[in-house]
């Protein structure tokens, strides 16, 4: 049978929209029971710089299905979407399209499926926002999302901007917004700080604070026409300042360009309100050309004296600032001028890479590296004085290109960090654990003018969407949200302890992120979005205007449908709506918003909040989701308004390839809806992988999912005219009812726990169950129709269009009784019959045993004799069931308490082991089950079946509970 999933979807989407079935009416007052019966779920809204793709489909379909399920559980569901357009990515895209950048044109034409004629109109941010908001809306509708579109908004809507302004006013009132200097990710081309959404590469990049250890040397330099010897600083960057005590040499790249520079620290005036900067001389430094540029961007003014090649420094001696030891500079082409300062400390006793590099260098000058030259600084259990040397020799690492060198480095560094203790060579720091020393050492070294700091990216390449390579820059006069505030962090930690997380394992990720959180730049000079209320030259950036908007959903319908103007949305209005503060009549008079509409907004917020579940992919854990928690605990005094739970799913790949908006693959949602039908896409994307795992979309598997849905529809079609009344039930009928209702328990749990893949597995299991049912002679069409009805409701949240079609075909859709609004089926314990299931499993296992014998003996059976175990063996099983949790060695004394069983004492130990191996389960009436299935077994094996007949071949003695003895004639 051919099923047109697209046509079916279009039919029901039109009907739903006409009848507005996903729009909840507003009420003047909600009862306490109604408040308990609400369900508010959201997903992180999409950024509109491209079409919605398979990654969006997975993340958004999870809450979509959950919303439909909760609606079928008689909940009043709020499920809606906004669109994110803030920041610079859309401006950057407009500029690239205006310039007709070939790669961008290709990506949006070929990957995003935008016709060239339409693409040529997308040269302004406004056109891009309008175009992609329409495309996103179409995508959601084509996939059949049960959204309340009355609450939709874009983050550049003037009404939403008023909400964001209010949010920032509240943060400022709580002293959580400050102005100052701070290192940030920065795009020199856009002249703006950049956030994750602004990046083409390196979204995961964080800032790492390196310690610059100030080694000194003497060098003849001509300055202002005078050539004389000057003291110069050669700073060396490290994340582990304690290793300075083990420095033997330093590495410099002879082929790179180095700058001799005068360095001045830029000192901010301490006078309140003053932006004045003074310069403080910090000496002559020698660093790589790239490092010179870094220093300029991090609170330093740099004056170039001279440019030299690294080879001019090879062989020079520098002085270790902590112990005044002489340290030679050796050549190394592995030193990158882009990392740190272009000069690297060498600690061969503890760094396997340094040990191998120094050994290789000595070999090149016919010298041998001896233990006398190594300096030990850390004690680790399991290693001697020189761990790097030990592991290199143990792993047989022969040179610097050996792949094992990376593993060796990781092993030693991990061991030292977790178990290492500083030794006597570290002076006053002897006895301190490595994991506890960094901050203290850094502070001491900086206070003694032996060190400074330098911020670097945690990964090598960070690229803005405009194509420019990003830098770390200390921005002065920048506005920050003070996420480093310890009291604020404490509140966030406390709430994370109380929240629900799916999967549970991510709870600790949130705790870690809260611990790591530093002050965050929250505004920029360029971009779409809300003007910073305290300084209109700035615009609130895209990860700061998207932390509380779930609260805006609750009032957006009232604002949108009543044409409330931005200027009417004054802070006092939001104070009343979200805090209940102020005089409603006075606010109404000042805003010209009727009292009943203000009450409606207040009531809607009070009714739907808190947010029950927030859904997102895992990339938003370290930013948006954590910021959401921070902002809620800061802006609401009562925990009853805090978000209750977060659901995080894995990423999506296409046939093993990572999704990429610029390089492909993309797989737009509309393509899925058009080529496969929305129900197929919804079913497949939510059941192809466990929630926390990455989902790899395979088109063959999607076709397989489609085929299974077609088979289900075919079965429904065959049964559409069958009467619903179920009369007498056979054993196999009871088994099928048991399977359906035992599955319902798992299904309801799975929906509530976001374990949607289990439902897919059970759906595929239904196919196998129905095959077994028919194979066992099941032919009760009334029962089959009942099963299909149950499963049509089960699938309705996932494949709503197909299920509406079946519901109508069964005649249940009269008067617009949509299945989407039906009550979800629940477990009926009266149908649960464990003995039925055990009996069918017993038959299947018996059949497997018979086949194994036939195959091994290579015989054609004429008669099969089946023998069940003696009664005393079932008594043993009964005792074992009663003591199922007891260790096996404790079973024998328990059984021997039974006087009747003692005479079988020699046989019982073997029986116990056999029962354990076969599985301890409730005894069943095996003889009756076999006799009931006798005709079936005879048909299966085309021979006579005799149950507990004459004991031919003395086989009966081998029978144990749940495993018959078999003799084949």
UniProtKB/Swiss-Prot annotation:
It comes from the Archaea. SUPFAM superfamilies: Anticodon-binding domain of a subclass of class I aminoacyl-tRNA synthetases (SSF47323), Nucleotidylyl transferase (SSF52374), ValRS/IleRS/LeuRS editing domain (SSF50677). The keyword Ligase applies. This is Leucine--tRNA ligase. It is an enzyme of class 6 (ligase). A motif ('HIGH' region) lies at residues 46-56. InterPro entries: aa-tRNA-synth_I_CS, aa-tRNA-synth_Ia, Leu-tRNA-lgase_arc, Leu-tRNA-synth_Ia_arc/euk, M/V/L/I-tRNA-synth_anticd-bd, Rossmann-like_a/b/a_fold, tRNAsynth_Ia_anticodon-bd, Val/Leu/Ile-tRNA-synth_edit. The gene is leuS. Gene3D superfamilies: Class I aminoacyl-tRNA synthetases (RS), HUPs, Isoleucyl-tRNA Synthetase, Domain 1, leucyl-tRNA synthetase, Valyl/Leucyl/Isoleucyl-tRNA synthetase, editing domain. GO terms for biological process: leucyl-tRNA aminoacylation. PROSITE patterns: AA_TRNA_LIGASE_I. It comes from Methanococcus aeolicus (strain ATCC BAA-1280 / DSM 17508 / OCM 812 / Nankai-3). GO terms for molecular function: aminoacyl-tRNA deacylase activity; ATP binding; leucine-tRNA ligase activity. It holds the Pfam family Anticodon_1. It catalyses: tRNA(Leu) + L-leucine + ATP = L-leucyl-tRNA(Leu) + AMP + diphosphate. A motif ('KMSKS' region) lies at residues 658-662.
């Amino acid at each position: 049978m051919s099923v047109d999933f697209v046509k079916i979807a279009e039919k029901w989407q039109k009907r739903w929209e006409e009848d507005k079935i996903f729009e909840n009416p507003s009420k003047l007052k909600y009862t306490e029971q109604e408040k308990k019966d609400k369900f508010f779920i959201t997903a992180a809204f999409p950024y509109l710089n491209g079409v919605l793709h398979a990654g969006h489909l997975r993340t958004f379909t999870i809450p979509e299905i959950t919303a439909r399920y909760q609606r079928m559980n008689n909940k009043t569901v709020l499920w809606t979407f906004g669109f994110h357009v803030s920041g610079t990515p859309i401006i950057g895209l407009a500029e690239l399209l205006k310039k007709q950048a070939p790669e961008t044109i290709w990506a949006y034409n070929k990957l995003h499926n935008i016709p060239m004629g339409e693409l040529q109109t997308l040269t302004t941010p406004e056109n891009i926002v309008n175009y992609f908001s329409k495309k996103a809306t179409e995508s959601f509708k084509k996939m059949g999302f049960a959204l309340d579109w009355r609450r939709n908004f874009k983050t550049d809507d003037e009404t939403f901007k008023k909400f964001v302004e209010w949010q920032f006013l509240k943060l400022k009132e709580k002293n959580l917004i400050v102005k100052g200097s701070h290192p940030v990710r920065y795009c020199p081309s856009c002249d703006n700080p950049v956030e994750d959404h602004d990046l083409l590469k390196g979204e995961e990049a964080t800032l790492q604070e390196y310690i610059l250890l100030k080694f000194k040397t003497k060098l003849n330099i001509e300055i202002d026409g005078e050539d004389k010897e000057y003291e110069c600083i050669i700073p060396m960057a490290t994340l582990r300042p304690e290793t300075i005590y083990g420095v033997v040499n330093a590495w410099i790249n002879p082929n790179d360009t180095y700058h001799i520079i005068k360095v001045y620290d830029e000192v901010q005036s301490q006078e309140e309100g003053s932006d004045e900067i003074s310069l403080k001389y910090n000496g002559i430094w020698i660093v790589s050309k790239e490092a010179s540029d870094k220093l300029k961007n991090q609170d330093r003014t740099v004056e170039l004296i001279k440019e030299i090649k690294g080879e001019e420094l090879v062989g020079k001696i520098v002085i270790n600032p902590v112990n005044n030891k002489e340290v030679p500079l050796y050549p190394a082409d592995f030193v990158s001028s882009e990392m740190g300062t272009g000069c690297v400390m060498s600690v061969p006793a503890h760094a396997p890479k340094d040990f191998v590099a120094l050994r290789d260098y000595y070999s090149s000058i016919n010298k041998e590296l001896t233990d006398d030259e190594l300096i030990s600084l850390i004690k680790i259990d399991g290693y001697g004085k020189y761990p790097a040397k030990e592991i290199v020799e143990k792993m047989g690492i022969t040179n610097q290109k050996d792949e094992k060198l990376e593993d060796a480095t990781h092993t030693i560094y991990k061991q030292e960090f977790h178990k290492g203790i500083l030794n006597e060579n570290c002076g006053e720091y002897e006895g301190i654990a490595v994991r506890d020393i960094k901050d203290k050492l850094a502070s001491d070294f900086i206070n003694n003018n032996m060190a400074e700091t330098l911020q670097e990216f945690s990964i090598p390449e960070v690229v803005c969407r405009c194509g420019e390579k990003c830098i770390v820059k200390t921005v002065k006069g920048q506005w920050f949200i003070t996420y480093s505030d310890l009291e604020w962090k404490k509140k966030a930690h406390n709430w994370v302890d109380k929240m629900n997380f799916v999967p549970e394992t991510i709870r600790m990720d949130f705790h870690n992120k809260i611990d790591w959180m530093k002050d965050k730049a929250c505004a920029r000079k360029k971009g779409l979005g809300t003007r910073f209320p305290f300084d209109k030259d700035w615009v609130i950036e895209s990860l700061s205007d998207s932390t509380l908007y779930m609260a805006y959903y609750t009032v957006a319908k009232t604002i949108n449908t009543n044409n409330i103007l931005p200027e009417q949305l004054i802070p006092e209005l939001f104070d009343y709506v979200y805090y209940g503060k102020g005089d409603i009549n006075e606010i109404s008079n000042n805003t010209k918003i009727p009292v009943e509409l203000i009450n409606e907004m207040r009531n809607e917020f009070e009714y739907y909040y808190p947010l029950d579940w927030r859904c997102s992919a895992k990339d938003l854990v370290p930013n948006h989701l954590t910021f959401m928690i921070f902002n809620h605990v800061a802006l609401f005094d009562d925990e009853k308004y805090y978000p209750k739970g977060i659901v995080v799913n894995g990423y999506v790949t296409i046939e093993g390839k990572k999704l990429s908006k610029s390089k492909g693959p993309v797989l737009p949602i509309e393509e899925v809806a058009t080529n496969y039908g929305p129900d197929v896409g919804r079913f497949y994307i939510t059941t192809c992988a466990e929630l926390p795992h990455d989902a790899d979309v395979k088109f063959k598997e999607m076709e397989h999912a489609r085929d299974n849905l077609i088979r289900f529809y075919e079965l429904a079609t065959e049964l559409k005219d069958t009467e619903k009344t179920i009369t007498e039930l056979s054993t196999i009928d009871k088994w099928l009812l048991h399977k359906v209702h035992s599955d319902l328990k798992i299904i309801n749990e799975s929906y509530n726990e976001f374990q949607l893949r289990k439902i897919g597995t059970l759906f595929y299991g239904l196919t196998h169950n129905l095959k077994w049912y028919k194979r066992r002679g099941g032919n009760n069409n009334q029962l089959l129709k009942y099963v299909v009805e149950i499963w049509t409701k089960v699938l309705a949240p996932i494949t709503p269009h197909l299920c509406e079609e079946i519901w109508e075909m069964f005649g249940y859709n009269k008067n617009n009784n949509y299945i989407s609004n039906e009550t979800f089926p629940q477990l009926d314990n009266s149908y649960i019959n464990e003995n039925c299931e055990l009996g069918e499993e017993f038959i299947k296992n018996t059949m497997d045993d018979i086949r194994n014998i036939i195959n091994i003996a290579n015989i054609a059976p004429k008669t099969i004799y089946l023998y069940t175990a003696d009664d005393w063996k079932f008594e043993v099983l009964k005792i074992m069931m009663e003591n199922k949790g007891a260790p096996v060695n404790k079973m024998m004394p328990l059984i021997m308490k039974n006087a009747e069983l003692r005479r079988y004492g020699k046989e019982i130990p073997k029986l116990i082991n056999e029962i354990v191996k076969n599985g301890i389960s409730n005894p069943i009436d095996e003889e009756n089950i076999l006799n009931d299935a006798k005709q079936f077994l005879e048909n299966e094996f085309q021979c006579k079946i005799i149950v507990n007949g004459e004991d031919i071949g003395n086989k009966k003695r081998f029978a144990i509970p749940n495993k018959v003895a078999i003799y084949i004639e």
